[in-house]
Amino acid sequence: NFSSCGYVPKKNNKRANRIEWEHVVPAYVFGIFFSEWTVGHPKCVKKNGKKYKGRRCASKVNKEFKRMEADMYNLFPAIGEVNGLRSNYPMTIIEGEEREFGKCDVEIKRRKVEPREEVRGEIARTYMYMDSVYPGKGIISKKNRSMFEEWNRSDPVDEWECERARRIERIQGNIN
């Protein structure tokens, strides 16, 4: 229901009308650190004999990648169209306020994404969590570390974020 949030679709497509589970830290960001993503694996062969690599291969054969891809702390609901347009672009601050989606305050420009202020803390903490739980996978670049630290400070944890973490801990078994 777009009227409840002021969202205006950029295109009239099916994804604008559905909610998808989005990786805050895109699978691509950590996926490229796995050989199954970059070069493939002997088990990654289609029925026609053609080899494949990338996310599909890493998901099929690498347990650590599967754990990272399914980590519930990194999954958040998003409007499907925004999720698709966001792609695997990095988070940043984009100068100006060109709102392409009505009142939905997200900006996507030049292969970069600026989330609304109210969720920047959750995004920063998600990146920090993934970076600490899965070290050595390039989750946070040196360039972005200070931005995420600032986002963490300017948008503190709220009660819903704590409740969400408790629920995930019960299901997934680890604490954030």
Question: Language-model segments: which ranges?
Answer:
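N-terminal module-boundary/linker segments of secreted carbohydrate-active enzymes
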Residues: N1-N12, N176
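Domain-level detector of nuclease and nuclease-like folds
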Residues: N12-N176
